[in-house]
């Protein structure tokens, strides 16, 4: 009887645990710390532990065969290093390898060193020099906090005023704390974005299904950036040609480069791609974990045994398997709390949740910022739920997801009404 552990509490981790729960011969999936959604599903059990050493103790005591890490913070804190030192099987990058995400400066220097296509950049920790560089470059221009900032450390400044204000916020105003003590300023890139997520075992790569995220809070990609308001898979802009090019120009050089630099990468590697009108590719960013909300539609389409993929990843044998996908489209819509992406309102009672989080075989509600209070599910974060559905095409998947989403409500609930619009407008 197999026991597994998923580290994290978001929609991505709920989707991982839900998919792992379908494993033949499974006894239990522990989720640390989990949320109200993972608390309510049959084979899942929440455990209130977040400290890496304590998690490793738990895994030893409960004979957990395999652990998978969802979010970036535990990776940057070295949870993989701790588990590996004790001989525990865990899929994810070490603290050192996770710098591809935890430091924008590390990632940009790495890409420059290994000739991986990305936007031209400069790094600053002192605001006078940063302001001067912006005046020299002009707008539009992109300013990124160096450290982890929950997807909110990026400002795409369309004017010089906006660019200077972002520098003041991050470097002088210390709005993002330590994460913003250094900034990376880079050229603005135009084109269509896609999320290209692969599994890496140190040397071999297994590509997962492509997807496209929707970062802005409002319809038509308006308003401030968020952690992501919805996603669908596959992304039609990732044609077979783009796929081959991404593997050849970005993914494989990254995996080889990390190994050559003495920091072999194991885990999920997520390259944010910018696909130019001419078919050129640039790397916008690296994440060293699956995306949220992209994981929800991706895992809804996965037909292969997820545990099998993870075990090959841990054992260094990803070259021996292929992943099989549902040919339908999966589309997920994030339902967010009032006032997100600013400080979200918490504690609102959520109405209309289906039993077992499921609206039938082809529509599922993945929980993120939820908690249980007096037997009821309440909002407990910015992105609260992700309603994900399968359909024969993007339009039908979109229709199914929104038909499910409207059954759920709470005070101030907000969501985008146009997830998937780029694929539909193609």
For the regions a protein language model found, what residue spans apply to each?
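Solvent-exposed alpha-helices and their adjacent loops that cap or buttress functional pockets
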Residues: 21-22, 38-40, 91, 113-115, ...
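Short acidic-hydrophobic, aromatic-tinged amphipathic segments that line or gate anion-handling sites
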Residues: 45-51, 122-126, 157
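A conserved helix-loop-beta module that forms one wall/lid of the active-site cleft
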Residues: 93-153
